[in-house]
Amino acid sequence: LNRIGAEQNSQMKRLDITSEKALGILNKVHFFDNFSNSEKDLITGFHSHFFLASKGQTLISEGAVDDSFYVILTGKVAIIKKDAPRPIAALHPGDCFGEISFLTKHRRTTSVKSLADCILFEIDRPTLQHMDAPIREKLKDNLIDVLVNRLNHMNDLVTRLSLRIA
């Protein structure tokens, strides 16, 4: 199987980051707004899941198998569909990617490429299982919010396109 997670992607470098620095970054990212400082402290304990990606790197590949999703802490990425003429979205700090494969256990549906140097927080299934239940639930709730917001956005786009065609 074509598995490309942070562990397998030799271009992404594991970041040697202090808990204080990681906490400072998490405090600036809206994905973690509903976490208490003590919960964020616990998350920074998973320091081996912080990665640095350089501009232009492919972070995940369409069709690959992986069990991780990523929260962008700094930088910007492009979401790319194989046959699309241009990127289908750009994501910024606080956004996440890879959540579809993480939740469904299916192959990656898009590729993701860094548009700038990025710091990413990787969450995989084993890591999620080792997190305290309240943190795990908040992460899952945040993923649900992300998916609902994206679905609402897609519904709006489909409605506007339908009106143009009619």
Across the structure, where does each feature detected by a protein language model lie?
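Cytosolic regulatory regions built on CNB/CRP/Popeye-like sensor folds
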Residues: L1-A166
